[in-house]
């Protein structure tokens, strides 16, 4: 992963309610006594399963506290990242608990909580690859990320071609097998991967002024 010249990215929870009707959704949640969160469950340390197969993570804990404050039960439905936003749109989820980055485009469509985490975006490459150490080095390279993620958008803005994946595990497999050159993700997510890695780790490639 690399520190790169990217704007600060706010991590927050995102709700299905638009700015026009947030009270309607809140009333529905309180009436049924339950708030339903969409989450991946495969993105450590934010939302993942522990050794007892329990859904845990920082986003999960924040969502549980939100439910507690509302006086309702928190229910989590797991799905792939690229389907979570559609699930919010379609009413399958009331909100997302999955490190949703606030962007201008998303803010026009969704309500966000205040940011509760700031993360740094980093470039992950194979340990023996010295050709990529900055965002500019991604030009002409192939990266792996979930298609609708801000990481994919960022990589493409620097001239990379993005291969779509379902989750971080698939991303790392493609990278270590040489099918892609790099991937972008939160720096802390990469460090979490190292804790449980069963294959030789990829390299976190630092670059100046990287933040997200």
Task: Indicate where each model-derived feature is located.
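Extracytoplasmic small-molecule ligand-binding "clamshell" domains
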Residues: 10, 19-99
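Flexible hinge/capping segments at coil-to-helix
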Residues: 126-142
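Ligand-binding cleft/hinge of the Venus flytrap
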Residues: 47-52, 63-72, 148-167, 194-199
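A structural signal for short loop-to-beta-strand junctions that line the ligand-binding cleft
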Residues: 26, 58-59, 107-117, 202-206, ...
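Periplasmic-binding protein-like
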Residues: 117-125, 187, 191-212
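Short helix-initiation/N-cap motifs at beta->coil->alpha
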Residues: 60, 76-86, 130, 148-149, ...
């Amino acid at each position: 992963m690399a520190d790169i010249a990217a704007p600060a990215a706010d991590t927050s929870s995102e709700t299905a309610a638009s700015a026009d009707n947030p009270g309607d959704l809140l009333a529905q949640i309180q009436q049924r006594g339950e708030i339903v969160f969409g989450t991946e469950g495969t993105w450590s340390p934010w939302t993942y399963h522990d050794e007892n197969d329990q859904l845990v993570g920082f986003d999960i804990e924040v969502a549980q506290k939100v439910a507690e404050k509302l006086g309702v039960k928190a229910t989590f439905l797991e799905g792939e990242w690229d389907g979570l936003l559609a699930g919010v749109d379609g009413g399958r989820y009331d909100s997302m608990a999955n490190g949703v980055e606030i962007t201008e485009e998303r803010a026009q469509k969704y309500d966000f909580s205040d940011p509760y985490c700031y993360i740094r975006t980093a470039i992950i490459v194979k340990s023996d690859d010295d050709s990529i150490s900055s965002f500019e080095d991604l030009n002409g390279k192939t990266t792996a990320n979930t298609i609708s993620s801000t990481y994919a958008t960022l990589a493409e803005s620097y001239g990379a071609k993005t291969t779509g994946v379902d989750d971080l595990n698939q991303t790392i497999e493609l990278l270590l097998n040489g099918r892609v050159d790099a991937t972008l993700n939160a720096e802390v997510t990469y460090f979490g991967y190292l804790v449980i890695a069963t294959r030789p780790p990829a390299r976190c490639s630092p670059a100046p002024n990287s933040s997200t």
